[in-house]
Amino acid sequence: MKIAELYELYKQHPVVTTDSRKCPQGALFFALKGDSFNGNAFAAQALEQGCAYAIVDEAEYAVGDDERYILVEDVLAALQQLAHYHRKQFKIPVIQVTGTNGKTTTKELTAAVLSQKHNVLYTRGNLNNHIGVPKTLLELSPEHTIAVIETGANHPGEIKFLAEIRSEERRVGKECRSRWSPYH
């Protein structure tokens, strides 16, 4: 399925989940894989819990002729591409906050200041990775006038990749030095 087609489904069902145990009615379930789990194995459960569609990348989990299973090449890539596609529908500034320490505090303070004049979408908690950033971007709505996205990294090149997903606008680098953090 092409991203534009997946986006049409998303517009009809604008809630995304990656946890089959917490499926809001009508949500899109993205069957992500981890080191110790395969989300594809939980696709049927997600549909039973009320998800409208299950996005899977292993054909054996797309049960029978059930059209609620959407087979893609890579579930994580589909989630990231969907978020990028969705983000591009909005002509608002997106501020990226990154750094070794202090990202979450800086993001929270930036969002608080901006909320005095704007309707701000911002990363909840520290959902700042290759899964959390796309999920946050998929919360963008026409009511938002600016977004503050926290990005973290656990491997080289991840910040650049996350910036590409959200479409580069502004970047705030936050560096905090202390005796506990001699990283710079």
Predicted feature locations:
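Short linear motifs at secondary-structure transitions and domain/linker junctions
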Residues: I3-L9, F29-A31, A43-E48, I70-E73, ...
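N-terminal leader/targeting and accessory segments in enzymes
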Residues: M1-Q81, Y85
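Short, structured coil segments at secondary-structure junctions
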Residues: G50, G64-D66, Q116, R166, ...
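Phosphate-binding loop of NTP-binding sites
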Residues: A77-R177
